[in-house]
């Protein structure tokens, strides 16, 4: 089964999204990856974000980011 891919930028992890990565990694239905740079420096500077199946998902806080990731997945099922 193909799992949704959640990608994090290491620079954004240092800015606070590390907690979101750790929460999402606990979900066995997700593939969570960490990369050196995803090339979204402007968005990265603004606050917590992740790529969800290639689409930018942001949150004002870590909790909001996690909720927005799950909301995005609910609204955009893979199958």
Swiss-Prot record:
<dbReference type="InterPro" id="IPR022916">
    <property type="entry name" value="UPF0349"/>
</dbReference>
<dbReference type="InterPro" id="IPR009910">
    <property type="entry name" value="DUF1450"/>
</dbReference>
<dbReference type="Pfam" id="PF07293">
    <property type="entry name" value="DUF1450"/>
</dbReference>
<protein>
    <recommendedName>
        <fullName>UPF0349 protein BCG9842_B0165</fullName>
    </recommendedName>
</protein>
<comment type="similarity">
    <text>Belongs to the UPF0349 family.</text>
</comment>
């Amino acid at each position: 089964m193909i799992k949704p891919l959640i990608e994090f930028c290491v620079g954004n992890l240092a800015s606070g999204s590390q907690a979101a990565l750790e929460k999402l990694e606990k979900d066995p239905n997700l593939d969570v990856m960490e990369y050196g740079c995803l090339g979204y420096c402007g968005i990265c500077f603004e606050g917590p974000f992740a790529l969800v199946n290639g689409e930018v998902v942001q949150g004002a806080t870590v909790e909001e980011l996690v909720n927005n990731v799950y909301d995005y997945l609910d609204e955009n099922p893979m199958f």
